[in-house]
Each structure stands twice: as C-alpha cells, then as structure tokens.
Regions:
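Aromatic-lined substrate-binding rim segments of carbohydrate-active enzymes
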Residues: 77-130
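Conserved, mostly hydrophobic/aromatic
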Residues: 31, 67, 75, 118, ...
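Boundary at the C-terminal end of the N-terminal hydrophobic targeting segment
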Residues: 21-25
Length: 199
C-alpha cells in the first residue's frame, strides 16, 4: 500500500513539475519620459514649412530608434504640457514648442505620428499629462482666449506668480477627465501617465 501511494505521488509530481515551467513570463516596463516642453527632448526644429515638418518627424524617429537600441519598450510622451497640448484638441490649443507660436498649427498630428512610430518599433506610447501647473503669468497670456484661466477661471488659482488648476475643486477633475477622454477616444495609446498631481 505504501509503495503504491509513493508511486501515485511520483506520477502526480511528474505532471505538476513540468507545468510550472510554463508560467507566464513577467512583463517588464522599461520606460522613459520624452519631454516636449520647450523642446527639451523634442522637437528642436519648429514646424513652419514642409521641410521643417519633415525635420521634426525625422528627429523624433531618430530619438525613438535610439530608445529602441537602448532596450526601452515604453515612451511616456508629454502630450499635455502647461495648459496646451501636442495634438489638435477642442479643449486646449497647440503648444508653442511645435511651431514657435502658441496655438500655431504644425500641419500634422504629432501625437498620431508618435504613436505610429512607437508601434512600428514594437514600443508602447503612454500619453504623459501634466495635470495641475498651467504656467506663469507671461505664459498664460500667451495661451490667449483658449486658456483654461479664461474659459474656466473658477478652477484656476494664481499662487506666487504661477497659475495652477485647483485640485480642491471637483470641476478640475471634470476638466482633466475631458482631456483624457479626448485622447483615449481619438488615439490608439497604450496608457495614461498623470504627472504633477500637486501644487
């Protein structure tokens, strides 16, 4: 009887042990932030003509190629900066980082292009959204009529010369959620990265 139980246990273990080798591999995120504010990481060329649009695109492709070679698999792409964005939006205007002029249309969709190029390289793109800071008084003036400080002043606060969305106001949640909804409904992004959730 004892020998029979030992044999049964050995047979059962013979089936169980090999199955443990088929566990799902761990997915590892190897990410970096790609800053568009002031062209810190990208773009260094302003999209003002067909030639400079192409230079802007080539620069992004070179950056993504370098990240791929360095074994990154995720790009946290700064999509909302300080009250402005890098895609055509019904809520906020284009950032001056793209054209040199706040609200200037770069005549292509940089977010769509970045997503396509990341996916072409087998990389994910997460939309990096700066949530609370809007900018100093000079920067907010440049945002003009489309600035959230003009459209929805009740959710904005000026503190020591810098404008912020008010995280204590429930309408701020609605405003930020509308930006996220706009992005996820229009683009094939792989994630959302919320940053500066503070004063």
């Amino acid at each position: 009887m004892y020998n029979r139980l030992i044999t049964i246990y050995i047979v059962i273990l013979g089936f169980i042990i090999p199955l443990s080798g088929y566990a799902q591999p761990k997915y590892e995120i190897r990410a970096t932030w790609l800053t568009t504010l002031g062209g810190l990481d990208w773009p260094s060329h302003k999209a003002t003509s067909a030639k400079t649009i192409e230079l802007q695109k080539q620069e992004l492709c070179k950056t993504l190629d370098a990240l791929k070679r360095a074994n990154f698999n995720t790009v946290l792409f700064q999509t909302r900066l300080r009250g402005d964005v890098i895609y055509p939006s019904a809520i906020e205007q284009f950032t001056e980082s793209l054209t040199g002029h706040e609200g200037g249309n770069p005549n292509y969709d940089p977010l769509k292009f970045a997503i396509e190029e990341c996916h072409r390289r087998g990389m994910e793109l997460h939309a990096w959204i700066v949530t609370i800071p809007i900018g100093n008084t000079r920067q907010v003036k440049l945002l003009g009529k489309k600035s959230v400080t003009r459209k929805q002043p009740s959710i904005c606060k000026l503190y020591k010369g810098t404008w912020y969305l008010d995280p204590g106001n429930p309408q701020t949640d609605n405003y930020l959620a509308s930006i996220v909804r706009e992005i996820v409904s229009r683009y094939d992004i792989d994630g959302i990265h919320l940053d500066y959730i503070r004063y």
